[in-house]
Amino acid sequence: MTISSPEREAKKVKIAVDRNPVETSFEKWAKPGHFSRTLSKGPNTTTWIWNLHADAHDFDSHTSDLEEISRKVFSAHFGQLGVIFIWLSGMYFHGARFSNYEAWLSDPVHIKPSAQVVWPVVGQEILNGDVGGGFQGIQITSGFFQLWRASGITSELQLYTTAIGGLVMAAAMFFAGWFHYHKAAPKLEWFQNVESMLNHHLAGLLGLGSLSWAGHQIHVSLPVNKLLDAGVDPKEIPLPHEFLLNRQIMQDLYPSFAKGLAPFFTLQWGEYSDFLTFNGGLNPVTGGLWLSDTAHHHLAIAVLFLVAGHMYRTNWGIGHSMREILDAHKGPFTGEGHVGLYEILTTSWHAQLAINLALFGSLSIIVAHHMYSMPPYPYLATDYGTQLSLFTHHNWIGGFCIVGAGAHAAIFMVRDYDPTNNYNNLLDRVIRHRDAIISHLNWVCIFLGFHSFGLYIHNDTMSALGRPQDMFSDTAIQLQPVFAQWIQKTHFLAPQLTAPTALSATSATWGGDVVAVGGKVAMMPISLGTSDFLVHHIHAFTIHVTVLILLKGVLFARSSRLIPDKANLGFRFPCDGPGRGGTCQVSAWDHVFLGLFWMYNSLSIAIFHFSWKMQSDVWGTVTANGVSHITGGNFAQSANTINGWLRDFLWAQSSQVIQSYGSALSAYGLMFLGAHFVWAFSLMFLFSGRGYWQELIESIIWAHSKLKVAPSIQPRALSITQGRAVGVAHYLLGGIATTWSFFLARIIAVG
């Protein structure tokens, strides 16, 4: 950190806007394709509607003015937030109007959450299953009930008011989106002022956001949950404002409240340990993290981010400059290092987006793994359907974000990369030795693929030949994951040294006792064996292939030996023109297309592994005789052969969805069928030739002309790229909905 000389702080930061830059015109807005000179003329062929969808949000294609593009993106973000608030409001409204939330609060172990009641049209009311507490409805697995309880919501009226608040926020967001594009649009310099942005996002969004959540947890969530855990009727619990206004209620629950802020200012922070704890592990009553631990966590996080939000230099000549940090970042082997990256990150929003999507996607997958191993909300861990849904959801969201990172990194390379500004810096050096990177990564993929798959093929062969003693398994030739087991043991023992006052380790998965709530396993030590070792190497293989495809797309987006002038052809193109055979499907867009399939492969195996492992080794009932798991520990015996995965996971566990007709789960049976159809429909687009369809269309047009009913807009076959886009969309939609119905019918029936 440096104190700057006067000339270094000459450029004062100020809020700079243009007044009324774009008039509000519903006439223009209502005209399809108003953003493009070509499209606004209207359709000649059916390709027009496809181009309309492809380019509506591609602001780069509307204008080359970076300021105008930035304003459109900024305004669109407010629109996105508005839609999110409407969605959130809808969730809370359903909780208020159509749910058994108050009944669930009184007995969260035996009553299942439901917030959707189907109207009795054509017999659909069969879907309203008995979820307990005298309520008929669809069992939900979103985790909202557990989140609401953790927030201290005790009545449906509170959900109503929050839902209304969500709509008010949505209106504010839509207004802001309009205002900051049409009335007071920020200048480019405002968008490029990274130090102010960092300070505001770190201190404001993350710092004050965490602090206000910690305050809510301490003053509302903790007392409400303490009373709920003690068995107090939700209707008897004081309203949230009473905890704030009447200190006596708080003193009865947390004696240190009587001391006020004196311990804080005299640094006697230990006095507050009755509501800011460091217990570790799970609350044995609810099976969730101790809410006093999470309040402590958010308070600590808030302090860190509030400090971080004062680190960057703006008008006061103190703090870091982002450009100086990047320009100074040179290592012995990295040439010019990060020189030139500041320009990239302030002039290419695609580059920014690529980095943020990669980080955010990875974070989502990390969240998926923490939601089950350290379940943050009360009674979340014993709601197996919700646990499975949250793991699956956060994995898929993360996968899409990471593929999106590859897409926008490639768009940056094609549209925004300037070779003259990037000489011998890290980016240039990576691009110059891309052949070494990609060929090594390819070798890794081949190695992982053959070896991991080879272990399974060996096991299937030995099993087929009746030679179990020659298989890789926990009972024959063991391949124990010794490093993973060492990590588990270390994390289990570590708190004895690092946090001697903690009650237990961070997660019950490391070791120790079973945490049971209401006779169900919330969490317990997860033992790893040969079957886990095998499938983990399949995970490594599929993830590396996904990375190979995406990284090759980025590094070869501008040029390759096959097509040296690829940058001139753009982000997506079908082939390098006529007369150049073998150059189809090489665009950066096509790499994203292929990457999506491998992302789907990777995550399918990850969520299948999770689903089976948890049913086999964790989830189940607890009696005096011990733990009885849902599938009785069959993962270790069966998951070491491909046949075992097909027979004992896919086939055995799909019986619930296949046999769901005539029951409350029958919608999942219909969805399972329909999603298979959507998936199969995708193959028609993926295995098609464009010329075949054009020929067919022309003979159909001939027939229409004969009957004098030919359309004025000429039908055309989908382009190669459009066909692949439609194909991958239906492939993923069909695959995801198939998995969704398979998982939920199974876990709701047995969990």
UniProtKB/Swiss-Prot annotation:
UniProt subcellular location: Plastid, Chloroplast thylakoid membrane
State where chlorophyll a' binds: 676
Q: Which residues bind phylloquinone per the record?
A: 693
Recorded superkingdom: Eukaryota
Amino-acid positions noted as binding [4Fe-4S] cluster in the UniProt annotation, renumbered to this chain: 575, 584
Q: Where are the transmembrane segments?
A: 73-96, 159-182, 198-222, 294-312, 349-372, 388-414, 436-458, 533-551, 591-612, 665-687, 725-745
State how the cofactor is bound. P700 is a chlorophyll a/chlorophyll a' dimer, A0 is one or more chlorophyll a, A1 is one or both phylloquinones and FX is a shared 4Fe-4S iron-sulfur center.
Among NCBIfam families, the record links this protein to: psaA
Q: What is this protein called?
A: Photosystem I P700 chlorophyll a apoprotein A1
Organism source for this protein?
A: Tetradesmus obliquus
Lineage, opening ranks: Eukaryota, Viridiplantae, Chlorophyta, core chlorophytes, Chlorophyceae
Q: What gene name is listed for this protein?
A: psaA
